[in-house]
Curated annotation (Swiss-Prot):
GO BP, sorted A to Z: arginyl-tRNA aminoacylation
GO molecular function annotations of the record: arginine-tRNA ligase activity; ATP binding
Assembly, per entry: Monomer.
UniProt name for this protein: Arginine--tRNA ligase
Catalytic activity: tRNA(Arg) + L-arginine + ATP = L-arginyl-tRNA(Arg) + AMP + diphosphate
Stated family: Belongs to the class-I aminoacyl-tRNA synthetase family.
First-level EC class: ligase
Lineage per the UniProt record: Bacteria, Pseudomonadati, Pseudomonadota, Gammaproteobacteria, Oceanospirillales
Organism: Hahella chejuensis (strain KCTC 2396)
Length: 578
């Protein structure tokens, strides 16, 4: 049950019945303060303005025809015309009993379901994954998991960079090492970052090697069998590096989700031909460009989208247009979500516009750039190693696990080593993921191991610890699979607040799915964890008399189920002991 949506429908209907224009939105939001109710409808002001009517007068008319059944115990008008709704305890109690009995927590599958293509992670296979790939990978995956949970058909597209001039350089270096010593080649490929660096040094310093690298580009593009075989070997090793990172991060991407740049190579000439046929191409100094009036530069000059260089080479824009067309015609997408750095905003908007003008995508297909900010160091600059190098994601995860190990061992010195390592892995990966996911994706954030591993504040360890405390209530009381009888009491203010929070889970997930913002879910789980802490301190559970004891156990079980489900949608594991 989506409580916010239900109230929106009922109050919108009442607005219309009270004389407001049809389709007037109720604008229902959760209230910021308990004295203003559980939800507040703010749509009366806009409707009253359209009717040239006093807002409070219209609000009174709305209340006269509003039928919330047994949902609300009180509805009142506040201020210039806000409608405050106070939910009924009895209604919430009955609703939560239904939530408790349903493995899906009464969250239905969306209908109609959509086909949603999600483009995320997309590392360049010439190098190992670095910290810059973290945001796209984990934010995209959290949204994918949420969309799938809501019943949509999600098609993951890992648009990896496996093509381009840098691969000529890498293949030439592979061949050089192979000729010298096969074992040396295998050792070098174990560290792709160093391999790339060595190849680049040869390219910059050895003219003969540079010529060889350029020849390899030509060979690769012409389909030379030996060259393609060498390239496939490199790509396979590079993808294995990515898969190791995905597994450690509990990211759902697999080899089957890889749709590389090279997959579109054969279609690139067709893209150019179709753009030309539509009259969209302009030759500018030998390059083929699409000029669109809606994209202007500083001097009010129209910015070009270059799709073919003067030397005949294709660009990212050409591949992106081919991918766009594939996602429309083959994958039949209703929505395409691109989890790509905010700095690519102009590029993607140009691609979307060119794709629509060329008829590559239908007008009703939604193209959404889920832009995200940068990961910064303590100095407020892009996160780097101490010597100014790129932070490899694998190294960062290893350090996170090591730091988590030290924290857990410090609190549990007698814990067996195997359990210690398992908890350190879960907490370390969760800390890195949650620290990122809990920030609004459009913002930059400062990476801090100390902050993300803290047991205080909006962190993974805090939420994971809340879950383990709930589980401990049941262990301590030796409460097994009991059949709970009776209603939830909700006598204390914190019990009531928890009931409202638990009933908001559905609308939170729909916000994540529609906006592509997992920080909404993180904020919800943090609030739920904080409220549980207040409940745990102020409301005895196991020592309470019946029926209060059973009521509080039911509330505790609902909290545990919701925390576990919410963390699972973020790709974060729960622990019963920390």
């Amino acid at each position: 049950m989506n409580l916010q949506q239900l109230l929106e429908q009922k109050i919108s209907a009442a607005l219309h019945a009270a004389g407001a224009p049809e389709g007037s939105p109720a604008i229902v939001k959760p209230s910021g303060k308990p004295q203003f109710g559980d939800y507040q409808a703010n749509g009366v002001m806009g409707a009253a303005k359209a009717l040239k009517m006093n807002p409070r007068e219209l609000a009174t008319k709305v209340l006269d025809v509003l039928d919330l059944g047994d949902m609300a115990e009180k509805v009142e008008i506040a201020g210039p015309g806000f409608i405050n709704i106070f939910l009924s305890k009895d209604w919430m109690s009955q609703s939560l009993r239904q939530v408790l009995a349903d493995p899906r927590l009464t969250i239905p599958l969306d209908s109609p379901k959509q086909t949603v293509v999600v483009d995320y992670s997309a590392p360049n296979l010439a190098k190992e994954m670095h910290v810059g790939h973290l945001r796209s990978t984990i934010i995209g995956d959290a949204v994918v998991r949420t969309l799938e949970f809501l019943g949509h058909r999600v098609i993951r597209q890992n648009h990896v960079g496996d093509w381009g001039t840098q691969f000529g350089m890498l293949l030439a270096y592979m061949n050089k090492l192979k000729a010298e010593n096969q074992q040396t080649l295998s050792m070098e490929l174990a560290d792709l970052e160093n391999f790339y660096r060595q190849a680049k040094t040869c390219f910059d310093e050895d003219p003969e090697f540079k010529d060889s690298a350029r020849q390899y580009v030509v060979k690769l593009q012409s389909g030379d069998q030996e060259c393609v075989s060498l390239w496939k070997t490199f790509i396979d090793i590079s993808l294995q590096h990515c898969e190791d990172v995905y597994e450690r991060l509990n990211v759902s991407l697999t080899r089957a989700d890889v749709m590389p740049e090279s997959a579109y190579n054969e279609d690139l000439p067709n893209v150019i031909d179709d753009l030309r046929e539509k009259g969209l191409l302009t030759n500018s100094d030998g390059a083929e460009c699409v000029f669109m009036d809606e994209f202007k530069g500083k001097d009010d000059e129209t910015l070009p989208l270059i799709v073919k260089k003067s030397d005949g080479g294709y660009l990212y824009a050409t591949t992106d247009l081919a991918a766009l067309r594939y996602r429309e015609r083959v994958l039949k997408a209703n929505r395409v979500l691109y989890f790509v750095d905010a700095r690519q905003s102009l590029h993607l908007n140009q691609v979307y516009a060119a794709g629509r003008k060329a008829g590559f995508v239908s007008p009703d297909m939604s193209l959404e750039h889920m832009a995200f900010g940068m990961v910064l160091g303590a100095d407020g600059k892009p996160f780097k190693t101490r010597d100014g190098g790129t932070v490899k994601l694998a190294d960062l995860l290893t350090e996170a696990q090591g730091r988590a190990y030290a924290v857990v061992k410090g609190k549990n010195p007698e814990m067996p080593e195997e359990e210690l390592n398992r908890i350190a892995h879960v907490v370390g990966m969760a800390a890195v993921k949650y620290a990122d996911l809990s920030k609004n994706r459009s913002s930059d954030y400062i990476f801090s191991f100390d902050a993300m591993l803290s047991l205080e504040g909006n962190t993974a360890p805090y939420v994971q610890y809340a879950y383990s405390r709930v589980v401990n209530v049941f262990k301590k009381g030796e409460v097994g699979n009991l059949t709970f009888e009776g209603d939830l009491q909700l006598a204390e203010p914190i019990e009531r607040a928890l009931a409202v929070r638990l009933l908001q889970f559905n609308e939170i997930l729909h916000s994540v799915a529609s906006e592509g913002c997992p920080h909404i879910l993180c904020g919800y789980l943090y609030d739920l964890s904080k409220e549980f802490a207040s409940f745990y301190e102020g409301c005895p559970v196991l020592k309470a008399e019946e029926p209060v004891r059973s009521s509080r156990l039911m509330l505790s079980l609902l909290i545990a189920k919701t925390l576990k489900q919410g963390l699972d949608l973020l790709g974060i594991e729960t622990l019963e002991r920390m």
